[in-house]
Amino acid sequence: MLLIAAFFLGLLFGSFLNVCISRLPKGESVVHPRSKCPKCGASIRWYDNIPLISWVLLRGRCRDCKEPISWRYPLVELATGVWFAAVIFEVWARSPNEMSIQLSGEWWAVHILTSLGLVILGFLLIGLMVMDWQTMILPDSFTLGGIAIGLFLVCTQALFLGPNEDQIVLSNHHIQLTSPGGVTDHGNLFFTGPESLIFGRIGAVCGAALLLLLIRWIYRAVRHRDGMGLGDVKLLAMIAAFLGFWPAILSLFFGTLAAAVYGAVLLARGRAVAASRLAFGSFLCIGGLIASLFGNQLINMYIALLR
């Protein structure tokens, strides 16, 4: 029942996501005016705007001008619905230790915050994937806004850390620390509580952005042209804000792999040349979706292979 509810909720958000995809790259408001047919300009009636159902009943055509309605609309709605259901299944059907975003503390807070973070990230990634593919634009309202949301969720997560994760650790005997109880000792100071979680995630955002900026600079120095835009840098930083540094690197790996395979297919078919541009952000979004649900499992499998 919960999966069905999540799926239908995802359909509703997918319908709104279609509005964002159509308007944000043009700099238009997503609130007004009302949605209209891009061909004839007729306003879309509320009963013609029901996710999936209206498209099927209208047989994929505008009620007024009979022009075809793009397949993108039902596909985005369906993808968002499936994503919402997949997140609920992954988070609520598995142990918290196997989640893509791991927390401890109150179990209900763990599940709710993890679910919320993943559905928001998936919503943003699906939208950015389509927008970059169609327009080569990654709007700041999604990327920078996503970074802000991800960091806000991390700060909220810090409120629900378990008691064993809110400690101060001393080691190596380099500095002196006096505790409120009057005990004096020497050592390095390590935070394992809220400070570690929050500053660790901020560091992940900065690290991911700097890494892609470095790759961008090296590519420009070697090829004498830009290989990726700053939007891709902000996109990877957004993924890191939600998932952390290593899942973001995993996203970069899968995104690069997918882009390389797609580019090789285009070259083999003669549909592109070496200098052709690819919507790398779209492939990075695919990598982000994979890392969101399976990132920790894949990283743990890789570590196990190295042992």
Annotate each PLM feature.
Residues L17, I21, W83, V87-V91, ...:
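Alpha-helical membrane-inserting segments
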Residues N18-L24, R59-I69, L125-T135, L212-R225, ...:
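C-terminal ends of transmembrane helices
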Residues M228-G231, A264-I290:
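Interfacial loop-to-transmembrane junctions
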